[in-house]
Amino acid sequence: MKKLNTQSPDFQAGLKALLAFETAQNPETERIVADICADVQKRGDAALIEYTNKFDQTNAKSIDDLILTQADLKAAFERIPNDVQTALQTAARRVESYHQRQKMESWSYTDEDGTLLGQQITPLDRVGIYVPGGKAAYPSSVIMNAMPAHVAGVKEIIMVVPTPKGERNDIVLAAAYVAGVTKVFTVGGAQAVAALAYGTETIPQVDKITGPGNAFVAAAKRRVFGVVGIDMVAGPSEILVIADGTTPADWVAMDLFSQAEHDEIAQAILIGTSQAYLDEVEAAMDRLIETMPRRDIIEASLGNRGAMILAKDLDEACEIANYISPEHLELSVENPQEWAKKIRHAGAIFMGRYTGESLGDYCAGPNHVLPTSRTARFSSPLGTYDFQKRSSLIQVSEQGAQKLGETASVLAHGESLTAHARAAEFRMK
C-alpha cells in the first residue's frame, strides 16, 4: 500500500495520483457492443438467441428456453437451505422498509389568484434489472435493484441474468422471487441490455435499466442511454476508512479487505491520525491476509490502488474524505454522528466501530448501488426516487390568466415569439 502524509509537500500530487483511474473507453469493446446492439435491434429474438448460445455456451433452440416463470423462481426459493431463505427475507424486508421512507408523494397548492400549481409523482411502467450470473452471482444485487422499483409501484420488473453453460444460481433466482421480480430471462451481456432497451418479439422494451455488469454491459448501458434511462455506469468498488485509533485493528483490516477482494482495481484507503495505529493496522493486514481465499486479488488491489494516509487531525481527515468523495466511507471514530455532519460527499456513510461496510452491502437497509470514481460529488445512491417520475401540474384560473398573461406576453415579444404572446393575450380580457 502507498503511504501518504498530509504534512509532506508533495501530498496533493500523491493524492491525485492515487485517485487517478483510467476510464477511457476501449474502442474495440465499443465497436463490438455497437454491432451487437444494432443486430438485436434489427433481428430481435433471433439475434438474442444466437449471441446467448455463442457467449454463454448454451443450446437454446427458441426464446422459450430462455424464459423463467414465477413457478421456476418459487421452486428455486424452495430448494435453497432454510437459513438462506431467512437471510434473503430479512434483507428484503429491511431494504423495503428503508426505501418506503424514500417514496416521493404528489403535492399541490393554490396561489393568491386561484392558480393551482403542483407536482404529480408516478412510477415508471416497466424496468429492467441486470444481474451478473454464473458461479460468482450476487443475490444482494437483485434485492437492491428490484426492491426500490417494487416500492415505487413499478408494475413490471424484468430481470436478465446470464446462465453460462446453462448454470443457474438458485439463490439469485430465490432473491428475485423474494424481491417481487415479474419476469426473468436467462440472457446477459450487451445483447441483454439491447433487448431491454429496444424490445424484441418476446422481451418488452423497458423504461430504465439498472444493475452492474462487465465492460460490455457498461458500454451497452452507455450506448442505449437516451432510448431508456440507466442508473449509472459504475467504476471499481471503493472504501475509505477514517479511524481515530479506538477500533480494533483487525476490524479495520478486514473492512479494507472487504472491498479489495472485489477485484484488482478496487480501492481501499485508510486515514488515521496516529502513525502507531496505522502501523498496527498494517501488521493486522499482514497477519490476516494469510487466511483470505482471495488473497491474490486483495494483494493486487492494495498494491495497485490502496493507501494509508496520516492526517494531523480528524477535521483534516474529513476534508480529505470530501475531496476523495468515496463510494463507502467508514467513520470508525468516537461520536461518529457529529463527524458525519462534516461530510459533504460520500455514497454511504457508515458511522461507528460496529458499522462494518459489509452490513450495508447486504442487509442494513440502504441501497448498495452507490456512486464511484468521485461521482458522489454530484450523484446519489440508487433509491425509490430513481423509479419515480415528476410531472408539473398547472391549472390557471380566469383571474390568473390576466396576471400571468401580461407577464408571458411581454417576455414572449422580447424573444420575438409572436404566437406565444398571442396565445397568452387571447386568454386576457
From Swiss-Prot:
Superkingdom in the source lineage: Bacteria
EC number: 1.1.1.23
GO BP annotations listed: L-histidine biosynthetic process
Pathway note: Amino-acid biosynthesis; L-histidine biosynthesis; L-histidine from 5-phospho-alpha-D-ribose 1-diphosphate: step 9/9
Cofactor(s) it depends on: Zn(2+)
Group of enzyme by EC: oxidoreductase
One GO MF term attached to the UniProt entry: histidinol dehydrogenase activity
Function: Catalyzes the sequential NAD-dependent oxidations of L-histidinol to L-histidinaldehyde and then to L-histidine.
Record protein name field: Histidinol dehydrogenase
Species of the source: Neisseria meningitidis serogroup A / serotype 4A (strain DSM 15465 / Z2491)
Gene responsible for this protein: hisD
